[in-house]
Design a protein with these regions (language model features):
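Amphipathic alpha-helical dimer-interface segment in Rossmann-like NAD(P)H-dependent oxidoreductases
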Residues: 88-109, 145-146
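Rossmann-fold cofactor-recognition segment
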Residues: 32-45
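Canonical Rossmann dinucleotide-binding motif of NAD(H)/NADP(H)-dependent dehydrogenases/reductases
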Residues: 1-17
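Conserved mid-core segment of classical short-chain dehydrogenase/reductases
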Residues: 42, 61-86, 126-129
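Catalytic Tyr-X3-Lys loop
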Residues: 56, 75-97, 113, 137
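Conserved glycine-rich Rossmann-like NAD(P)H-binding loop of the short-chain dehydrogenase/reductase
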Residues: 16-28
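Structural signature of the Rossmann-like NAD(P)-dependent dehydrogenase/reductase core
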Residues: 63-67, 111-117, 154-159
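Catalytic loop of short-chain dehydrogenase/reductase
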Residues: 111-136, 141-142, 146-149, 162-164
Length: 170
């Protein structure tokens, strides 16, 4: 995503080592063109070891911006599309959180941030599946925080949105 690439560039400018993990070949190509160090998500369970191979250690920080573009009226979605959405937008994230959480637990240190959306609370027509996936992500990260905060791992969710601050009105 544009946000993910901007975040990776900003962190890199601050001296952080970053790795953009992408689900698709298109995402890998965009990150590569932007000069970012990138890796295919593939099987999430192998991500900590693949990071160890690249950086000498598993990830200590995770910013999760993963989401699909699946938007449909709830009653209008094809059953196959719903199953794919659940597997990718919920199941794949759960596997990622589990794998990275376990590797952080072994080190007794980790910081995780899930980037959600205001659609989680207030979806517009056609955003039911997107909103549901964001709510599921928030629940996973909230549960990770509850379960592992006493062991050095913190997790939180951020709901991004536009704010009407009342400025600039004519």
């Amino acid at each position: 995503s544009q946000l993910g690439m901007a975040l990776a560039r900003a962190l890199r400018e601050e001296g952080a080592e970053t790795l953009s993990v992408c689900r698709s070949s298109e995402g890998l190509a965009r990150c590569g063109e932007a000069g970012l160090c990138c890796l295919s998500l593939g099987e999430p369970e192998s991500l900590p070891e693949r990071c160890r191979g690249l950086f000498g250690e598993p990830p200590a920080h995770l910013v999760d911006l993963m989401h699909s573009r699946f938007e449909s009226l709830i009653a209008g979605a094809a059953p196959e599309a719903i199953m794919e959405w659940a597997a990718v937008d919920i199941g794949l994230r759960a596997r990622l959180v589990r794998a990275v959480g376990r590797s952080m637990l072994a080190r007794r240190f980790g910081r995780c941030v899930f980037v959600s959306s205001s659609a989680a609370e207030c979806p517009v027509e056609g955003q039911g599946y997107y909103a549901s996936a964001k709510l599921a992500g928030e629940a996973l990260y909230r549960s990770l925080a509850v379960e592992l905060s006493g062991r050095g791992i913190t997790a939180c969710s951020l709901r991004l949105s536009w704010l009407d601050a009342g400025r600039g009105a004519a």
